[in-house]
Amino acid sequence: MDSKTALIGMSGGVDSSVAALLMQQQGFSCMGVYMRLHSVPCGGANHSADAAAVAQKMGLPFQVMDFQDAFQENVIRPFVSSYESGLVPNPCIRCNRTMKFGVLLDRALDMGYRYVVTGHYARIRQEETTGRYLLYKAADRAKDQTYFLAGLTQRQLAHIRFPLGELTKEQVRRLAQDNGLLTAGKKDSQDICFVPDGDYVAFMERYAGKAYPAGDFLDLSGKVVGRHRGAVAYTIGQRKGLGLAMGAPVYVCGKDMVKNTVTVGPNEALFSSALRGCDWEWYPFPALTAPMAVTAKTRHSQNEQPAGVYPEENGFARVEFECPQRAVTPGQAVVLYQDDLVIGGGTIAQAL
């Protein structure tokens, strides 16, 4: 396999366009690929046509590859199942692990390409003494995407390139403008790609072919205080849209999917001093064997919080925060850092 070959995942946006440009400038033999994952229109934009136009301008071979069946199996079905079981999943993390760097990587290797390249903002380095591939934050902290990438395996990192990791977004747009790429001024996408209107409950009802039944709101003592429109419609920490008049603000504190109840309470009831995480991927070492001081994020938008991580049995690890954290939500990712280095990423199994 030629080490200077790369399959470029081109989304039709400016980041993947510049990633393709940089790999070509570095002397790689490249091919552009647009992954067709679903049939949901995204604001009328023709992303595949934009990707094709950029590839044509660069003289790159280009294909649209249909991965809709794999996306249904690996992302949408688990997304719906997780919500129905009371979790709040992050489909972008699962898509990165199973699709962009899962089925697309497998396809790339089968075609003889050494690397899959995307426009993510992150950095990968190989540690000389251990040979392990390490994941680092991007130079542009405001655009860093390591929270969404911390489920990638060593095998995957060995075949991934992130050429934007050392650049700022401003530099990326300038490169696109200087090279006449039509995506230079294109806005970044924000929403879950298969739920562009943000109404994930309506999406799940269409997907599952059913309506989720109404149930009871309970206070912390278990008293019925109102009716809700289906437990799947609520997330931990939610205040808006509850339709409850209780004399003081209340927030979603918990859900019982078997009984179809949603528990509400005051803001102070939302804070947790620790969490238990599962399905960990560790980067400096194969497994956590001793406690470590880290900083932790339980949401992408959150500032890192000082914490300690402690190994537990059966691959679990406990994260204890210096200060209690609000709305720690099972199903979401927890990512641990030391400075720029990602120590590990897992899934929140339980708030403690």
What is the meaning of each model-derived region?
Residues 1-150, 161, 169-171:
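ATP-dependent adenylation/nucleotidyltransferase module used to activate substrates
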Residues 119-352:
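AMP-forming adenylation/ATP pyrophosphatase catalytic core
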